[in-house]
Design a protein with these regions (language model features):
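A gly/proline- and charged-residue-enriched helix-loop-helix capping module
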Residues: 158-172
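N-terminal secretory/targeting leader peptides
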Residues: 29, 34-160, 178-405
């Protein structure tokens, strides 16, 4: 082909842009290069065609990439438990904050897998995510329960969350999950109040009362109550009251006034012992299948992180309102008698925790590493709190105590 020659005749080149509402069909020869006005007209036609093409193609691409992402989750809680309500609250917050781009559906315990099978189901992708507590994974790796039912070293649940976010806890949890091949992305949230010692046939007056007692608990508290002499059975929440009703348990603990009332504890016991060190600083866990989580857009991951912290605050406020109301109704309507756990029992719990921690740390290097991290944070944080936060008992007695005649 000679220099300067082209394969086609310029005058025969056609511009065809396939747009649903326009088809431009013009020859370059229709716009003589010597006519300035016609040249401008030609450029305007070309420009308009390009803009129109972009206006159509961009929405088509967006449509191909958009559409809500649906996730099927399960909680470890019965549908009637306030804990499942918290799970639904969390899902709604994420769904709303993503503008519906992520739609999480949360099923109650047992819908797909048993409560204690949540970790495996999420890790394998049978479920996209779940709502539960780390203590329910105790059988997979006992150090996981240090976020749920360990000694906490004087910290409350909010301090555990502070340690988790700012004291290295999140990194240690990721390390733990990696050690057992857990394909999960975990978020902790929702500080729980100190849990009762439990529900019994008669008040607990000394540690020896646990000797031979058939008792329900979970996580590291299994080791604690076993050391106290109890015959421990780790049952999920929905199975506790039926077991007590059939005489398979002499006593049990679950969590709080609202959950315990909704699950039917007052129907099988009228004695509840308040305060204990077996679960004084528990939190909830939000779990995503990591493969699915990693595939989410960065913006959506940021929303999930923010929604988790927002849900954590809201849950703690709802708990104060609901638990206090149910605490009153347990006494007035259900005729439950509440007793404070004797200090001697609490002291024995602390002594046994020291022994359990020492033994577990010797057996499990990761357990030892987590305990060291928690203790270092607690020594500083708890001292600050104890030195600065006033004991409110004086104010409560002043404003609401019995008035002199």
């Amino acid at each position: 082909m000679a220099p300067g020659k082209t394969l086609v005749n310029k005058s025969e080149v056609r511009i065809r842009i396939a747009i649903p509402f326009h088809v431009f069909d013009k020859k370059l020869g229709d716009f003589p290069m010597t006519d300035t006005k016609k040249t401008t007209a030609r450029r305007n036609v070309l420009k308009g065609a390009a803009v129109a093409a972009g206006a159509v193609s961009a929405p088509m691409i967006a449509k191909a990439q958009s559409g809500p992402i649906s996730m099927r989750w399960q909680s470890t809680w019965p549908a009637k438990d306030i804990f499942h309500e918290y799970a639904l609250d969390y899902a709604k917050k994420v769904n709303d904050m993503t503008g519906g781009d992520l739609k999480i559906e949360v099923l109650p315990a047992g819908s797909v897998v048993p409560a204690f099978g949540l970790l495996e189901a999420v890790s394998k992708g049978t479920l996209d995510g779940g709502h539960g507590v780390l203590g329910y994974h105790y059988g997979k790796q006992n150090a996981l329960a240090l976020w749920n039912s360990g000694p906490a070293f004087g910290m409350d649940a909010n301090m555990i969350l502070a340690w988790h976010k700012y004291g290295g806890g999140a990194e240690l949890l990721a390390k733990l999950y990696a050690s057992i091949g857990g394909n999960v992305q975990s978020f902790l949230y929702g500080p729980m109040a100190t849990q009762p010692l439990g529900w019994f046939k008669k008040p607990i007056t000394k540690s020896a009362d646990f000797k031979g007692l058939k008792f329900r608990t979970n996580g590291l508290a299994i080791d604690l109550f076993t050391a106290m002499g109890a015959a421990v059975n780790a049952l999920p929440g929905g199975e506790i009251v039926p077991a007590m009703d059939r005489g398979l348990l002499d006593g049990a603990e679950f969590n709080n006034a609202s959950s315990d009332r909704l699950l039917g504890f007052p129907d099988v016991s009228k004695v509840c012992m308040l305060q204990s060190f077996h679960q004084s600083a528990e939190t909830f866990e939000i779990m995503f299948n990591k493969t699915k989580y990693d595939s989410l857009p960065a913006k959506m991951k940021a929303i999930i992180a923010g929604a988790t912290e927002a849900a954590s605050a809201d849950m703690s406020w709802k708990a104060v309102d609901r638990y206090s109301k149910d605490y009153v109704e347990l006494q007035t309507k259900d005729k439950v008698k509440f007793y404070k756990t004797p200090d001697s029992v609490l002291q024995d719990q602390l002594k046994l925790w020291s022994e359990i921690v020492e033994k577990k740390s010797a057996e499990n290097p990761l357990f030892k590493e987590i305990v060291a991290s928690q203790k270092a944070f607690a020594q500083r944080a708890v001292k600050w709190e104890q030195d600065t936060v006033i004991n409110r008992r004086m104010a409560v007695n002043h404003f609401f105590g019995a008035k002199k005649a």
